[in-house]
Curated annotation (Swiss-Prot):
Listed InterPro entries: Cys-tRNA-ligase, Cys-tRNA-synt_Ia_DALR, Cys-tRNA/MSH_ligase, Rossmann-like_a/b/a_fold, tRNA-synt_1_cat_dom, tRNAsynth_Ia_anticodon-bd
Protein name per the record: Cysteine--tRNA ligase
Gene: cysS
Description of how the protein assembles with itself and partners: Monomer.
Keywords: Aminoacyl-tRNA synthetase, ATP-binding, Cytoplasm, Ligase, Metal-binding, Nucleotide-binding, Protein biosynthesis, Zinc
Protein location: Cytoplasm
Length: 465
């Protein structure tokens, strides 16, 4: 398996720290608002990475944190008239609602910053003792000059960074690039007691302290969005390696941005979309399919047209799965030619995933499987053994992509299946009673809502369009 490592700027063979285990840390959301579609990309992608490792037989220790205290949370809490701790907890609950609908599994651990203050304080103390950090008037800063490898992750030169620094001038700092490990409490803000007086952690130290606690030194994979490479992940590397004297994470993976009309998504441009707003129009599995349809390091342009294309592509798979369920196969074992074809599709799938998790190419193998499967069903030669092989192959894609195929849709969290089936039953009774106008009215109204009824030898089927 090869992974593109941001640290070395090359694809490298993945060799885990411990055979049979993968230790992963992915930066989670700052809990001051609902997640947007840009947040959803790393959440879904790294969930898929975790799923693939598990499919290959690895035990995955997966940590995704919550930053539940920072300036944005404090400001939002003031607006909402609740405490920052309450606000953080509120949006953690809302995060899980959205993540569940995107098919995201719970991490092994979801640590919160507010529950790891002692570990953070110990790490800050250690950095001061080792000469990498200094305290000024209740604030503690990391001295970037003290760490000779500063810039190695992002590829930035420290002297050039100093020359072009647009950092807010702070006379307390020795160097404008020095970053806060501990912030002195301001009036009215939450605070914790520390050796430097009341205060709270800086942003970067949180992830270092929590990843070292749960994954240990020199863990396997650290992931996040490309926007975190500098300064967040660069600062994590500096403070962690200064603290332990050992390499931090071994493989750094970063997903590309989501754009809207080729522009970066931002609130100021008004092209900012919350996941739950999108889920009002599209099922979670369609959104997940869309997010995995492009290689994770490439930019991904977002609009309704592309989501509709993802929906149509997913329906092709759904229709095949439905046809496979309904076909009455011939008795007999799987045919050799079918075994060989399906083995080839799964080989292509594995090769794509092992080449830096190329989900787009892996999906192409799924559609090859679907095309071939449809021809076999149409031929009338499908055996019971053939059918079982197709079902087993589909289970692999479901397991890794985290998408159930052939299921009836949910919109805005509501399962419409019982309502549609009730209307189908009412329509059937109306037709028996020769009330064809009313039966046609139900069919036509459902069509207006995007639901098509199809008469088949086994009864009426329905699907979305």
């Amino acid at each position: 398996m090869k992974i593109y490592n941001t640290l070395t700027k090359t694809k490298e063979e993945f060799i885990p720290r411990e055979p049979g285990k993968v230790y992963m840390y992915v930066c989670g959301p700052t809990t001051y608002n609902y997640i947007h579609i840009g947040n959803a990309r790393p959440i879904v992608f790294f969930d898929t990475v975790r799923r693939y490792f598990e499919y290959k037989g690895f035990e995955v220790i997966y940590v995704q944190n919550f930053t539940d205290i920072d300036d944005k949370i404090i400001n939002r809490a003031l607006e909402e008239g609740i405490s920052p701790i309450e606000l953080g907890q509120k949006y953690i609950i809302e995060y899980f609602k959205d993540a569940d609908r995107l098919g995201v599994k719970r991490a092994t651990v979801h640590p919160k910053v507010t529950e790891h203050i002692p570990e953070i304080i110990e790490m800050v103390k250690g950095l001061i003792e080792k000469g990498y950090a200094y305290e000024v008037e209740g604030n503690v800063y990391f001295a970037v000059d003290s760490f000779s490898d500063y810039g190695k992750l992002s590829g930035r030169d420290l002297e050039e960074l100093k020359a072009g620094a647009r950092v807010e001038v702070d006379e307390k700092k020795k160097n404008p690039l020095d970053f806060a490990l501990w912030k002195k409490a301001k009036p009215g803000e939450p605070y914790w007691e520390s050796p430097w007086g009341p205060g709270r952690p800086g942003w970067h130290i949180e992830c270092s302290a929590m990843s070292l606690k749960y994954l240990g030194e020199n863990f396997d994979i650290h992931g996040g969005g490309a926007d975190l490479v500098f300064p967040h992940h660069e600062n994590e590397v500096a403070q962690s390696e200064a603290f332990t004297g050992k390499p931090f994470a071994r493989y750094w993976m970063h997903n590309g941005f989501i754009t809207v009309n080729q522009e970066k998504m931002s609130k100021s441009l008004g092209n900012f979309f919350l996941v739950r707003e999108i889920l009002e129009k599209f099922p979670g599995r369609v959104v997940r399919f869309f997010l995995l349809s492009t290689h994770y390091r490439s930019p991904l342009d977002f609009d309704d047209k592309k989501l509709n294309e993802a929906k149509a592509a997913l329906e092709r798979v759904d229709n095949f799965v439905q046809n496979l369920k309904e076909v009455n196969p011939l008795p007999g074992e799987a045919r050799i030619e079918i075994q060989e074809k399906i083995t080839n599709f799964l080989r292509d799938f594995n090769e794509a995933m092992e080449d830096d998790f190329n989900t787009a190419q892996a999906m192409a193998s799924l559609f090859e499987l679907v095309r071939f499967g449809n021809t076999q069903i149409a031929s009338g030669n499908l055996t019971a053994g053939d059918k079982k092989l197709f079902e087993e192959a589909l289970n692999v894609y479901t397991q890794v992509f985290g998408i159930e195929f052939g299921v009836l849709e949910k919109i805005a969290g509501e399962d419409i299946t019982p309502f549609v089936e009730l209307l189908i039953e009412v329509r059937a009774r109306l037709k028996k009673e020769k009330k064809y106008d009313l039966a046609d009215f139900i069919r036509d109204e459902l069509k207006k809502q995007g639901i098509i009824l199809e008469d088949t030898p086994k009864g009426v089927r329905w699907k979305r369009v």
